[in-house]
UniProtKB/Swiss-Prot annotation:
Residues 29-143 bind DNA. Transmembrane segments: none annotated. It comes from Arabidopsis thaliana. PANTHER family: B3 DOMAIN-CONTAINING TRANSCRIPTION FACTOR ABI3 (PTHR31140), TF-B3 DOMAIN-CONTAINING PROTEIN (PTHR31140:SF103). The lineage of its organism: Eukaryota, Viridiplantae, Streptophyta, Embryophyta, Tracheophyta. It comes from the Eukaryota. Gene3D superfamilies: DNA-binding pseudobarrel domain. One of its GO terms (biological process) is glucosinolate metabolic process. This is B3 domain-containing protein At3g11580.
Amino acid sequence: MSVNHYHNTLSLHHHHQNDVAIAQRESLFEKSLTPSDVGKLNRLVIPKQHAEKYFPLNNNNNNGGSGDDVATTEKGMLLSFEDESGKCWKFRYSYWNSSQSYVLTKGWSRYVKDKHLDAGDVVFFQRHRFDLHRLFIGWRRRGEASSSPAVSVVSQEALVNTTAYWSGLTTPYRQVHASTTYPNIHQEYSHYGAVVDHAQSIPPVVAGSSRTVRLFGVNLECHGDAVEPPPRPDVYNDQHIYYYSTPHPMNISFAGEALEQVGDGRG
């Protein structure tokens, strides 16, 4: 195996793994960053409807309650996210009663600096489709396309690459067409003693060429651009019979006189 072939195979495997990983993620929500989200406040405000749906706080009681409940929501909890490179980011997630908002605080400013985020950029959150406790975070620049179409495009491209990889040098349509056409021809002419041979390591016929084979008064015209095995003769009534397999339809013309001779021979 050549070095280039090895690297190409490894690259295809790596891209396939990435495509599978992306397909296993479920988009939760995204937010366009405000100046305060990337400013000196060092916090990201999570829209309330998304926060309560996807990141519910334990012992959360926003409508009043004991001092312990309020202290719990203010303290919050740690949320862990994986970025596009697989790196883990941990943020302090809590509810601020003063502003009645859900926020990511500790760890957020480091993420902003690492990704060089500015106001107008977008952050989006995802979750694993099967492991619901596994969360992901990503970002894109202002004006770039949404993440959902990107996932769709990757999935379609992966499908095309997979088809091209398994098909190799064989055209899938021709492979199926030949396999479905072959049994009918074999059954039709098997009683004449025709021999069917598997086509392995057989030179192809030049495209555009045709060949006519006469079989008991039947002219079989086989068009080119097909792979056909070498003829195998069989003997029926001291006559040599040749069989040619082809995935293309055959033009059959009957010679009445020859058929009558065959009938007389059988009688």
